[in-house]
């Protein structure tokens, strides 16, 4: 604890492991809205944030649960869901007139093909202008769910393991082998909003 004048207590959000203030300052100095992408185990959240002295303001937001309302039957925490969430956010942002942004990955490590960069790719495909490097974004096969399809086909021989792994897909009426077509169908639906 703070016992004398030499000890400096870090900001509360830094102590809690929520904010990297050096990175945040760099993003705010750009003067552009921030594309904030966050992933949990079962959901993906994307927001377009603008700075305000009283606190950041959310300009546009998209949640992977919105995809379910649009007819998405896959898992809301996987890579195709992250891509579609970014696409939905980008479409809403372009409609609102916010076509330029900068990616705010927060405390997430920049790993090639991560869900945060799938959100970025979705926003780019919707027509937003966000500075990025192409090598960090996952392949198209992973963004549309072909890797899930390939895994389902390899697991098809063991019926019990297949049913256990893909029980929610089957419960919702979607064969995991049909996921790429389902993602493309939903992509067209979002682009035509």
Curated annotation (Swiss-Prot):
This protein's record includes keyword Plastid: no
Keywords of this entry: Ribonucleoprotein, Ribosomal protein, RNA-binding, rRNA-binding
Parts forming coiled coils: none
InterPro entries membership: Rbsml_uL18_euk
Gene3D superfamilies according to UniProt: 3.30.420.100
Keyword Cell division assigned: no
Gene Ontology terms for molecular function: 5S rRNA binding; structural constituent of ribosome
Listed GO biological process terms: ribosomal large subunit assembly; translation
One CC-aspect GO term: cytosolic large ribosomal subunit
Pfam family, any one: Ribosomal_L5e
HAMAP family named in the record: Ribosomal_uL18_A (MF_01337_A)
Its biological purpose: This is one of the proteins that bind and probably mediate the attachment of the 5S RNA into the large ribosomal subunit, where it forms part of the central protuberance.
Family under the similarity heading: Belongs to the universal ribosomal protein uL18 family.
Subunit record text: Part of the 50S ribosomal subunit. Contacts the 5S and 23S rRNAs.
The protein's name: Large ribosomal subunit protein uL18
Organism field: Methanococcus maripaludis (strain C7 / ATCC BAA-1331)
Gene name per UniProt: rpl18
């Amino acid at each position: 604890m703070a016992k004398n004048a030499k000890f400096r207590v870090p900001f509360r959000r830094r102590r809690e492991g929520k904010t990297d203030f050096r990175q945040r300052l760099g993003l705010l100095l750009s003067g552009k809205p921030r594309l904030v992408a966050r992933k949990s185990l079962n959901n993906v959240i994307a927001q377009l944030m603008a700075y305000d002295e009283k606190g950041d303001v959310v300009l546009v937001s998209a949640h992977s649960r919105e995809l379910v309302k649009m007819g998405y039957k896959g898992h809301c925490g996987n890579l195709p869901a992250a891509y579609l969430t970014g696409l939905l956010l980008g479409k809403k942002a372009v409609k609102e007139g916010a076509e330029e942004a900068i990616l705010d990955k927060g405390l997430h490590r920049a790993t090639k093909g991560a869900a945060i960069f799938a959100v970025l790719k979705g926003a780019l495909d919707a027509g937003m202008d966000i500075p990025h490097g192409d090598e960090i974004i996952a392949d198209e096969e992973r963004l549309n769910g072909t890797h899930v399809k390939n895994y389902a086909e390899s697991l098809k021989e063991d019926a019990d393991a297949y049913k256990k792994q893909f029980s929610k897909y089957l419960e919702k009426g979607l064969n995991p082998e049909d996921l790429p077509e389902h993602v493309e169908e939903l992509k067209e639906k979002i682009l035509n909003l």
